[in-house]
């Protein structure tokens, strides 16, 4: 009845949540699985990172959005069922079941595309990505949110894994190391917004990477229900490469499943060797293992690997595999064209688009592999517009609209934007304002700032935080949100000043931002930028 370790990669503030933002009562929030809470926050942040306004995704807008959520832990469900009958409330089932975790995201957004909870254990989130891609190809949805979550609430699973000799004694993953003896459990979550590439290009979206292909299979009958299968792993990687129309030598990097177990590591390297083992490669295939950095996030593990691979391609740098002292002697490394990164290293080739594979294998026998490629500059970039007044506006300034559900959240959002502009002083002001306008939902507490340069905008934000007057700022007000109306569109066509437009925003009008930019900047095509996300106001909702 004991665990071999209490160490792991744990998140703080298990029960903290912004119930008000998601329109949940305190009573319902108390019964909500922390995994459901995390999924809601991740979905909102994924949309904001993509520059997609969540309030424009409702069914009335005619846009189909799918939700594919990897989720496996039943800690909260077990905890709720252990309560006395008198303590059971009306929210036990909806707050605990995995099906509702995905459904709640769809409900929150008001969308009616496919909504699936995926439980294939450690491969859940990567299987969710595979299913999301299939749904997009079949045109079941225009946008797909895919991800995974994992929170550890009780010691039950850790005791089970300890008795099954799965966990390392110090809670660390030593992937591919001679001392590998098990994995360390971890909490976490991640979610990505997916579109068909042609749609993302047409929308001027910020394309982070392109999924070329994916595959899913099962071990079938192997040495045991939880035992990995070299044959099945080899097959799923080959299927994903075939779906991507790539040859093995075109892949630069593989983010492995890499749990750091004495059984699993040699089997995985054996499968990789069977696919990528040709010695005539132009450069070694680098094998990464994010579990050495974060631990094993179980249902969210595949998402951690995918996000790491995307970031590595963007920065053209591969992070080190930690806890790697001596490569596993049970693996014939000399016969394989593989490289383990003991320190951060540059991307192995400077030519062509970086290409990577990501693996995730569930202990139920379900395997997944996804092949990614860095976004082409032609797809992901557009020439930055000059910081000069467009010819059809009376003002020479750009308008930044900011809003939040509460005054405190608005102040924190202002601070985040000021920090962002300090970190990226050469950012295109026009594209910042474009993204903040069309790529965000707009709430009751509002602020509008008019500026001609990023420096001037940052100074105005600093003045707002300090309580100093600045003529560039249109005072914030507590307003109700209205509906788009013909008067607003007429004002745009009439080329009224940005000050007038800002005042309408502050007064609570639900403005038609795409029409504004289309009519005021008809010859310009803006690229959505990475901007700060919403500052959730979390409070404690727990036992």
Positions of predicted regions on the chain:
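Short coil/turn segments at secondary-structure boundaries
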Residues: 3-5, 56-60, 429-434, 473-476, ...
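Condensing-enzyme catalytic core of the thiolase-fold
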Residues: 1-391
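Short acidic, Pro/Gly- and aromatic-enriched capping/linker segments at domain boundaries
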Residues: 522-531
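Acidic/polar, glycine-anchored loop/turn motif associated with catalytic or activation segments
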Residues: 43, 501, 513
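Helix-rich "cap/lid" substructures immediately adjacent to catalytic or cofactor-binding pockets
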Residues: 99-102, 499-507, 516, 520-521
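Flexible catalytic loop/linker elements that gate and position reactive groups at enzyme active sites
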Residues: 228-243, 355-510, 537-540
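Flexible lysine-rich "adenylation lid" loop at the C-terminal edge of ANL adenylation domains
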Residues: 531-533, 539-543
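Residue-level marker of motif borders
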Residues: 114, 252, 360, 401, ...
